[in-house]
Amino acid sequence: MSNAITMGILWHLIGAASAACFYAPFKKVRHWSWETMWSVGGVVSWLILPWVVSALLLPDFWAYYRSFSAATLLPVFLFGAMWGIGNINYGLTMRYLGMSMGIGIAIGITLIVGTLMTPLLNGKFGVLVGTAGGRMTLLGVFVALVGVAIVTRAGQLKERQMGIKAEEFNLKKGLVLAVLCGVFSAGMSFAMDAAKPMHEAAAALGVDPLYVALPSYVVIMGGGALINLGFCFIRLAKVKNLSIKADFSLAKPLLISNVLLSALGGLMWYLQFFFYAWGHARIPAQYDYISWMLHMSFYVLCGGIVGLLLREWKTAGRRPVSVLSLGCVVIIVAANIVGLGMATN
């Protein structure tokens, strides 16, 4: 396995670790509605950071974006909005199915859809099946899906042992939302593929290969921001017991703490895709679809490890922890299979 591929996998792991940890600061926010907290973090992660980073990278910020036609930018924006819809559905999926089943189904579907639809739509799937390296990477995708399923089973055992139930369990509604969440969340993978002309233009301007995807985030995350912030603002305006005015009328020390914690959560959220861009840059072009598989499977892996480190599994018993450990090992094996496949001609 080449150093470039190894580093690509490592950067995806670091990005996924940030994704697994980003909600920790949000949990410390007090006396704010979820909508206000999510909006403040979202403004940082979807608007401020993509714009600031792009302004630092590009020699002429406005000229870069003006150089693209609407036919190039619109699909990138719409796929970003598609991913934003998946974000909203994610929370509802957890509500009706519970954390473990919801995450397992949603992540499993988005892993498959986001990974395999791109080569299918681009007419490259036959090439992948017809080469030794392609077949090995596809095997790695399947093994990763098995790993996600095992971790999901561990979560179910944990919830059963600890008496944790879904807020409003509804299997039919939850499954529909999980499928929608999985499909729409794959919009980020599609957006990255649609943004290739933007990446190439950034490279032509002399932007380092590690950073060429970052300017496209202004458009991708702009689409996601429209959906997420729109959802939050509508709820803040229409739901009687929600009030952004009340949330910002707290005592100054608590208000500052809430803003900083939400901003930190937003920063950590952004970093997952900052390092995703680095990892994506190191993956061979013919296997760029694998970036999404690595990100999502590592997200599940890191989520399990973080849960163990935070002692969330302390009272779950030995069997759930053993099953979780097995699932994590399977995901690590999947990453190695994919890495070997990418290194095979």
Curated annotation (Swiss-Prot):
Q: Which reactions is this enzyme annotated as catalysing?
A: L-rhamnopyranose(in) + H(+)(in) = L-rhamnopyranose(out) + H(+)(out)
Keywords in alphabetical order, please: Cell inner membrane, Cell membrane, Membrane, Sugar transport, Symport, Transmembrane, Transmembrane helix, Transport
Record flagged with keyword Transferase:
no
The UniProt entry lists the main location of this chain as membrane
| One Pfam family, short name | RhaT
TM annotation in the entry: 4-24, 38-58, 68-88, 101-121, 131-151, 175-195, 214-234, 259-279, 290-310, 323-343
Domain of life of the organism encoding this protein: Bacteria
* CC annotations in GO: plasma membrane
Protein localization = Cell inner membrane
Q: Does the keyword Cell membrane apply?
A: yes
Q: How does it sit in the membrane?
A: Multi-pass membrane protein
Which Gene Ontology molecular function entries are recorded, alphabetically? rhamnose transmembrane transporter activity; symporter activity
Cross-referenced InterPro entries: L-rhamnose-proton_sym_RhaT
Alphabetized NCBIfam families for the sequence: PRK13499.1-1, PRK13499.1-3, RhaT
The record, for HAMAP family, names: RhaT
| Cited function | Uptake of L-rhamnose across the cytoplasmic membrane with the concomitant transport of protons into the cell (symport system).
Family, per entry = Belongs to the L-rhamnose transporter (TC 2.A.7.6) family.
Tell me what this protein is called.
Answer: L-rhamnose-proton symporter
Which species expresses this protein natively? Cronobacter sakazakii (strain ATCC BAA-894)
Its gene? rhaT
